[in-house]
UniProtKB/Swiss-Prot annotation:
The keyword Cytoplasm applies. One of its GO terms (molecular function) is UDP-N-acetylglucosamine 1-carboxyvinyltransferase activity. InterPro entries: Enolpyruvate_Tfrase_dom, Enolpyruvate_Tfrase_sf, MurA_subfamily, RNA3'P_cycl/enolpyr_Trfase_a/b, UDP_GlcNAc_COvinyl_MurA. GO terms for cellular component: cytoplasm. Pathway: Cell wall biogenesis; peptidoglycan biosynthesis. The active site is at C117 (proton donor). Its EC number is 2.5.1.7. CDD domains: UdpNAET. This is UDP-N-acetylglucosamine 1-carboxyvinyltransferase 2.
């Protein structure tokens, strides 16, 4: 099993090119099932979850061609299987995203209940409730969601999510584009990745209004065409590298980004004492060798502070000047990195969904174990600033969401390498 060896204490300097967003690429790939012609998706990151989605689409009968630049062509005209099996779905929660498209286009889908990161239940009940309201007959039995469309086509409905759900919004959005009539989604997720999916669907002929707001209206069409689309850049990867610059007191520029999607993070970096310069598709952070100031964080749905950046800011706050409060409102059980950061000398107290972080002068390298995707990123960041060697185990978690992280950090001056026990 691979692990990362990090010798910390070096300020990071330089530029890093940000990859396409996994959380946009996965629903867009799932949405290719809706098209009657082939689609070509570019700026797709080379990640384990992407490979899993390709395997899943292939198992359903789609024909995929991938070139050396990770341009992915999907032809779903020959789809003839309607089962998303446990062996694929268990490794990636986003597999649930094939449910809406398969039900809308083919009228049936059997999808194993999803897996993914071990950060709470993240139930799919909200997806199923909305699809049932649109006319789907759904049962959950033996670990599978069995969905059938009773009337040939799903029916447009007025829907309201009890709580904001990104994958739920995406699943229903994809189902609604081929439904009969108009679907209105209230309390919809406003994340940029939802907007990116909507833009992809619109390019294929869908009629969607309001993506990026809390109310999305979809007028169903008979079919969708093929097309080409470039996936948006990964705002969480961008924030992670900016955090690496901040906690090592360095200067890091992230390129090929959309600064408008980073605003909640950028405000907090400025609050921490960073000097920011923002261009059309780049952001530069400079700490001028200053220790970051502690910043309070409360996660909430977009456009508020992203839960996927909580762990990285905790790593920064661990070595910041002062004390901070971090409140996690999205997922339970998302403080599993705390115990590992404490092994490195971090001073953190937990009380339910709140962490109190008292910044320390230095962290010390230690063997630590990643428990989920973003927790692994926080441990890598801590290793970059710690004295001595840090060994991060179970880095298959980080490979699910970060493309060549050790190579990109090395380009910024980090002493980091991947080794294998095999």
């Amino acid at each position: 099993m691979d692990k990362l060896l990090i010798n910390g204490g070096k300020a990071l300097h330089g530029e890093v090119v940000i990859s396409g967003a996994k959380n946009a690429a996965l629903p867009i790939m799932a949405a290719s099932l809706l098209a009657s012609d082939h689609v070509t998706i570019s700026n797709v990151p080379h990640l384990k979850d992407i490979t899993t989605m390709m395997e899943l689409l292939g198992q359903l009968g789609a024909h995929l061609i991938v070139d050396e630049k990770m341009n992915v062509q999907v032809d779903s005209s020959q789809v003839n299987e309607f089962v998303a099996p446990y062996d694929l779905v268990k490794t990636m929660r986003a597999s649930i995203l094939v449910l809406g498209p398969m039900l809308a286009r083919f009228g049936k889908a059997d999808v194993s209940l999803p897996g993914g990161c071990a950060i709470g239940t993240r139930p799919v009940d909200l997806h199923l409730k909305a699809l049932r309201a649109m006319g789907a007959d759904i049962t959950v039995k033996n670990g599978y969601i069995n969905a059938r469309c009773k009337k040939g086509r799903l029916q447009g409905k007025r829907l309201m999510f009890d709580t904001v759900t990104v994958t739920g919004t995406e699943n229903v959005l994809m189902a609604a584009v081929l439904a009969e009539g108009i679907t209105t989604i209230k309390n919809a997720a406003r994340e940029p990745e939802v907007v990116d999916l909507a833009n992809f669907l619109i390019q294929m002929g869908a009629k969607i209004r309001g993506a990026g707001t809390s109310t999305i209206e979809v007028e169903g069409v008979e079919s969708l065409n093929g097309g080409t689309y470039s996936v948006m850049s990964d705002r969480i990867e961008a924030g992670t590298y900016l955090a690496a610059g901040a906690l090592t007191r360095g200067q890091v520029t992230v390129k090929k980004v959309r600064p408008d999607t980073l605003l909640s993070q950028l405000c907090k970096f400025e609050e921490a004492g960073a000097e920011l310069t923002i261009g059309e598709d780049w952001v530069s952070l400079n700490m001028h060798n200053k220790r970051p100031q502690a910043v309070n964080i409360a996660t909430a749905p977009y456009p508020a502070f992203a839960t996927d950046m909580q762990a990285q800011f905790m790593a920064m706050n661990s070595v910041a000047e002062g004390s901070s409060t971090i409140i996690e409102t999205i997922f339970e059980n998302r403080f599993m990195h705390v115990q590992e950061l404490q092994r490195m000398g971090a001073n953190i107290q937990l009380n339910g969904n709140t962490a109190i972080v008292h910044g320390v002068e230095k962290l010390t390298g230690a063997p630590v174990m990643a428990t989920d995707l973003r927790a692994s990123a926080s441990l890598i960041l801590a290793g970059l600033v710690a004295e001595g060697e840090t060994v991060v185990e179970r880095i298959y978690h980080v490979d699910r969401g970060y493309e060549r992280i050790e190579e990109k950090l090395s380009l910024l001056g980090a002493d980091i390498k991947r080794v294998s026990d095999r």
